[in-house]
């Protein structure tokens, strides 16, 4: 539904699957090879890299948005498409000290000043995607690190651009409300009006008030939403705005 009536020249979809089971609606978008992955393991980065390699074959692809199967859109396609700037990648960044002790071994290869941690659910531009698939030293740096998917890309960009990193990326902070990130997630202890008290919230239901709040917030996407949550998401105001992109729709 999200891509209904959208010009197909404006997007491509690439799906890396954990299990090779037929997808009812998206089977044609599965990538040609499966990279076996484990939770919080460097193998996830290898799978992401393979998707990037596939996506880079299309010269018209300017940005690469990583999503999980539990993501939902919180803005219309055209809004997201028009608000991505070609020169930037987008990251939701943690405090650098949060890298330790998970990536202590990386200090064998690089200086502490380059270490960074960010949400896996970043948006890479073409320039940075090409850099990351053509220079994969970070796979060695973080091969034994927990949650390497949160370390590799942002650290390598920090290592490459140094003090000029801020000119290459648009970053939001873990210390900010989570709805300012490009992909929202509700973690325990965050500065959020509807904060969970149980680590990462897996939504089986969302109140209308919270859904409206997220639609009005800067975030493009949100996670983690279980399939059953669709019952509380598929409301007219959500579908009119996010799917139909009704101009001037008043849901505020």
Regions found by a protein language model. Give the residues of each.
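ER/Golgi luminal nucleotide-sugar-dependent glycosyltransferases, focusing on the catalytic module
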Residues: 1-252
């Amino acid at each position: 539904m999200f891509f209904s009536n959208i010009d197909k020249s404006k997007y491509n979809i690439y799906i890396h699957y954990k299990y090779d089971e037929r997808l009812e609606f998206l089977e044609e978008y599965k990538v040609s090879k499966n990279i076996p992955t484990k939770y919080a393991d460097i193998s996830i980065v290898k799978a992401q890299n393979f998707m990037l390699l596939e996506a880079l074959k299309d010269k018209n692809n300017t940005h690469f948005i990583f999503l999980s199967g539990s993501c939902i859109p919180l803005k219309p396609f055209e809004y997201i498409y028009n608000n991505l700037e070609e020169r930037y990648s987008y990251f939701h960044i943690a405090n650098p000290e949060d890298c330790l002790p998970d990536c202590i071994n990386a200090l064998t290869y690089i200086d502490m000043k380059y270490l960074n941690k960010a949400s896996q659910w970043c948006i890479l531009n073409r320039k940075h995607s090409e850099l990351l698939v053509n220079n994969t030293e970070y796979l060695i740096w973080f091969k034994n690190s927990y949650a390497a998917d949160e370390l590799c890309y942002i650290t390598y960009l920090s290592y490459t651009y140094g003090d000029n990193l801020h000119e290459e990326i648009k970053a939001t902070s873990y210390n900010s409300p989570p709805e300012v990130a490009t992909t929202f997630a509700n973690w325990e202890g965050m500065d959020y009006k509807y904060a969970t008290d149980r680590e990462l919230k897996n939504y089986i239901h969302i109140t209308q008030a919270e859904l409206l709040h997220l639609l009005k917030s800067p975030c493009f996407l949100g996670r983690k939403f279980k399939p059953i949550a669709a019952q509380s998401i598929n409301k007219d105001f959500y579908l009119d705005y996010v799917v139909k992109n009704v101009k001037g729709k008043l849901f505020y």
